Amino acid sequence: MQAETSGLINLAQAKQLVDLLEAGQQEMADELIRDIASPIQKELFDEVGRLTRQLHSAIVDFQVDGRLVELANSEIPDAKERLNYVIDMTEQAANKTMDAVEESLPLADALTMNVQAVKPSWDRLMRRDIQLHEFKALCHDVQQFIERSESDSNRLKELLNNILLAQDFQDLTGQMIRRVIELVREVESNLVSMLTVFGEQPATDKPRASEKCVEAEGPIMNADQRDDVVTGQDEVDDLLSSLGF
């Protein structure tokens, strides 16, 4: 069983309209039609006024939103500078790290070769299978090895410390990247708000091609010399207020 719906006209009104038309009471029939349509017209008028007020308020808020101007004039250019700075800092850190590693590798290789050069004679010494002149030469080699190792190990320590210090850019650049992300989110939010105000309606809301279209008048010429048009947001606001919206 279908639920009853409230129609635009009831049976009694329809019969009354037919009776008036059959009796030739055209004016009374027209008056009855106007009475029937009056609530519908008022509801439509109220809805159009409400939507107009919402759109007007949104446009005014959009125009006076100083945050959008600030975003365009300062925040976005500043964000580009921040990202460029992050790129520069990352590149500098990468170069410092690679330079330190390139210098460290030969030092590590030299330590390995020095150990390999001394190890055979040292092994013979541990086996007590070494001549006196070989022992003297081993002592000189060990002395040179200790001196070179001390110098190379100190340099390796400096280079490793440089690599560690080169990574301190991450804290600063991380903060900058997070700030840029916040800015992008804020811009996205403003764009969504803008699309809400000025965006297109869904396709289902568009009028069908078969329906009668209203011809656009185009821009109003000499608007400041006419009394039947409004020329600014203040006048729009006054008009809506006078209509109760």
Swiss-Prot record:
It is found in: Cytoplasm. GO terms for cellular component: bacterial-type flagellum; cytoplasm. The record marks 175 as: Enhances dephosphorylation of CheY-P. Its EC number is 3.1.3.-. Belongs to the CheZ family. Plays an important role in bacterial chemotaxis signal transduction pathway by accelerating the dephosphorylation of phosphorylated CheY (CheY-P). This is Protein phosphatase CheZ. It comes from Shewanella loihica (strain ATCC BAA-1088 / PV-4).
